[in-house]
Amino acid sequence: MSKRKIFYSFHFDNDVMRVQLVRNMGVIEGNEPVSPNTWEEIKRKGKSAIEKWIDDNMAGKSCVIVLIGEETHKRPWVLYEMKKAWADGKGLLGIHIHNLKCARNGTCKKGVDPFSQITFKIGEKIVFPKVYDPKPTDAYNDISNNLSTWVEAAIKQSSGS
């Protein structure tokens, strides 16, 4: 099976180093991170520019992975990305990344599940996108060994299967 194209959603300032660990696993094909300078430039252009950037970068992706750090649930653009992914019929899942070690800050506290802030439906049926909490003793390998399976399950769920 070919690698799925993935859009990663996360809290840039707090979690970019942990996110890089996941991206560099090479298990799936993810979007390239935006540089801090580019992101600041996009933000200065306002809400519609941010939405356009997200929409453009999410296009062509089959799944959105929300990498959940300590404060991810507070980020309005993460919530926008989750809603957009679901509305577009993309696979959607979350992974707690608090036990991945950041080179600067080590690990962090487990964050609140941002999926609890949104109701997801297929037709009239309420569904719950899966949120994974990797083993605290070996989070990196747990994610690496299971990521492609988790992505396939999320894509299957979003299609109503």
Language-model segments: residues:
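C-terminal interaction surface of TIR/SEFIR-family domains
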Residues: 1-7, 18, 103-161
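Conserved N-terminal substructure of TIR/SEFIR domains
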Residues: 1-63, 146-161
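Short, glycine/charged-enriched secondary-structure capping and boundary segments
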Residues: 21-24, 79-82, 107-109
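Conserved nucleotide-binding/hydrolysis micro-motifs of P-loop NTPases
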Residues: 13-15, 99-102
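Conserved beta-strand termini and adjacent loop/short-helix elements that scaffold enzyme active sites
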Residues: 34-37, 95, 131
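Conserved beta-strand-loop-alpha-helix hinge of the TIR/SEFIR fold
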Residues: 57-86, 91-101
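Short, low-complexity, polar/charged sequence segments that are solvent-exposed and flexible
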Residues: 26-29, 84-87, 113-114
